[in-house]
Design a protein with these regions (language model features):
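Gly/Pro-rich turn-and-neighbor structural signature
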Residues: 106-175
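Glycine-rich beta->alpha junctions and the first turn(s) of the following alpha-helix
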Residues: 229-305
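Buried hydrophobic positions in well-ordered alpha/beta secondary-structure cores of metabolic enzymes
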Residues: 23, 172-174, 248
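Short, surface-exposed, low-complexity cationic segments
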Residues: 30-49, 183-193
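N-terminal-proximal low-complexity accessory segments that begin disordered
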Residues: 1-43
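Internal helix-loop-helix
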Residues: 47-135, 187
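Structural beta-strand/beta-sheet cores of well-ordered domains, especially the beta-sheet scaffolds
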Residues: 17, 133-135, 168, 186-188, ...
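A short core secondary-structure module
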Residues: 175, 179-228
Length: 305
């Protein structure tokens, strides 16, 4: 499929996903004032017709197709340099789609446990790339009492868990919290939040499901106030991104979308793999923020003579 336009991206989010913000059900993100700024920011990642950005934003796949560079597996120093440069220009929606690199990083290890899981990882990466989709890093559980293991909590759903397995797939229940841009992606890529022991096997789960999958609900929050005006909020009026509390209310996931289902020794491998790519984005953001602070300090000193 061809690369999406900004308008096609926004239209693709009108898929019946269940979203809430301040207790209000959001039926259409394209018509919601709360999502106006985040959508404007995220849709710029689809401006492939910008001649100044197109070369950086895209690459040729092994089949010769044009794809977004966020899906490129860096194999040379130049590949990595371009990826890092791209990361400084992307929105949070584009940035967190790097979760597919975390999956690719564990693919060989998980193949030794279950080759089908590795094949599923490859297939979902190719599917998302071919359809120019975006994905969220869905990892942080509610956790509850941090001194207890996942299976020792008073509420068993404080960590996302498998509640049923069948010949067709798994059913999961629980929630993941503080998920950046969850409401504005197409795929929710779920990983364990930490290493798991044998008694916690039901909590050792990884998969990808559509954001509009039955049983998925996303409760949004943001640092940006509900009513923005450029004078009082010069930054938030142009750049903000919500985070979501993603609730999985007995969500069914077919086996072809599952990457881990009870193999507890692999849970920590998944959790650590995400850190490599997530921390890279964090460091790039820290460097940009440091430049802003230095610039502000210079401006203040100049104003004070």
């Amino acid at each position: 499929m061809p690369l999406k336009t900004p308008a096609e991206y926004i239209e693709s989010l009108r898929d019946g996903r269940v979203l809430y913000w301040d207790g209000e059900r959001i039926d259409d993100v394209s018509k919601s004032e709360r999502f106006r700024v985040p959508l404007a920011v995220a849709s710029r990642d689809y401006e492939y017709d910008d001649p100044g950005r197109r070369e950086l934003m895209t690459y040729r796949t092994e089949e010769g197709e044009l794809a977004h560079r966020v899906y490129q597996i860096p194999r040379t120093e130049e590949d990595l340099r371009k990826r890092l440069e791209l990361a400084t220009t992307m929105s949070m929606v584009g940035g967190v789609t790097g979760v597919f690199m975390a999956l690719q990083a564990v693919k060989d290890e998980i193949a030794a446990v279950n080759p089908q899981y590795a094949e599923n990882i490859e297939n979902i990466w190719r599917y998302a790339r071919a359809n120019d989709l975006r994905a969220a890093e869905v990892i942080t559980d509610a956790k509850g009492d941090r001194s207890r293991k996942a299976n020792q909590q008073d509420d068993p759903d404080l960590y996302l868990r498998i509640v049923d397995k069948s010949s067709k797939g798994i059913t999961v229940r629980g929630a993941k919290l503080h998920i950046s841009a969850a409401a504005l992606v197409h795929e929710l890529v779920v990983m364990p939040t930490k290493s798991m022991r044998e008694a916690e096997a039901d909590y050792a789960v990884s998969f990808s499901c559509p954001a509009n999958a039955p049983g998925v609900k996303i409760i949004n929050r943001s640092f940006a106030p509900a009513k923005l005006n450029e004078f009082d909020y010069p930054a938030s009026a142009h750049h903000s991104m919500p985070e979501g509390f993603v609730i999985f209310d007995d969500v069914f996931v077919p086996w072809e979308r599952v990457f881990l289902a009870g193999e507890h020794r692999m849970a920590g491998v998944f959790a650590r793999s995400l850190g490599l790519w997530e921390r890279t984005l964090g460091l790039l953001e820290a460097a940009e923020r440091a430049e802003q602070i230095i610039g502000l300090a210079l401006l203040v000193s100049e104003q004070q003579g």
